[in-house]
UniProtKB/Swiss-Prot annotation:
Its cofactor is Mg(2+). This is tRNA dimethylallyltransferase 2. GO terms for biological process: tRNA modification. It comes from Bacteroides fragilis (strain YCH46). The gene is miaA2. The record marks 107 as: Interaction with substrate tRNA.
Amino acid sequence: MTMPDYDLIAILGPTASGKTPFAAALAAELNTEIISADSRQIYRGMDLGTGKDLEDYTINGRQIPYHLIDIADPGYKYNVFEYQRDFLTAYETIKQKGCLPVLCGGTGLYLESVLKGYRLIPVPENQELRVRLAEKSLEELTAILSSYKTLHNSTDVDTVKRAIRAIEIEEYYAKTPIEEREFPQLNSLIIGVDIDRELRREKITRRLKQRLDDGMVEEVRRLLAEGIQPDDLIYYGLEYKYLTLYAIGKMTYDEMFTGLETAIHQFAKRQMTWFRGMERRGFTIHWVDASLPMEEKINFVKQKLKEF
């Protein structure tokens, strides 16, 4: 099919919605490449814990090229400013081949940072603010964060450290006039994968059990043995938080499993809250039922491309 006037197709959805196999099948159909929008899959060696599922990028024996996966070492604190830079590099590489890039992921902050069309600026540390917030609980910090109207909110913020950093960024933006930087205004077709809540919960639990069977605990122990500090792994949240606490003896296996399962369910709910927030902020998201056959989902996107 002829390429439309869109600059980008974005496939977004909560964890366990099947967005990656969908994006890969679509990329195969359109003969293009994928740019990941996942804040943790950028780390090398953090595979099971981030749910990379790299086999999803092979369609009928053909490897679909992907970008922004395995680009940083564990322990490094990659940020949204670097993501914007690296996204543009990948985007321009794909466009130079005459292809329509497919952006795929569930990290709302990363998705919105490139779909919004303005460059974010690095925010310095505010030690005074950090001291002031140090004694607050995650719940109190989340309440503070939810009062802000701009890009950051509670998605991807499941540790106190991340919440404080997000508040630090919001405070800086509130007090510092931000001139909008050069960033391409991308005309994006945004497709959301809508999965039934109960089905999503079933898939999350099943997937968690499978990844534990596949060696997710051993992956965390290996990272610790390689010298990654426990606090640095805990910083990444979710699987790495709970599995590290289990690996260093701060939790029993049952406590780890129950706590992690609950945290992933809550995370998926926050992802959907973010995507609904994007719609309120003016983004048009075309939702497709996750349970549809793959061919129907691909045809749904093709139809949207033709409608432009």
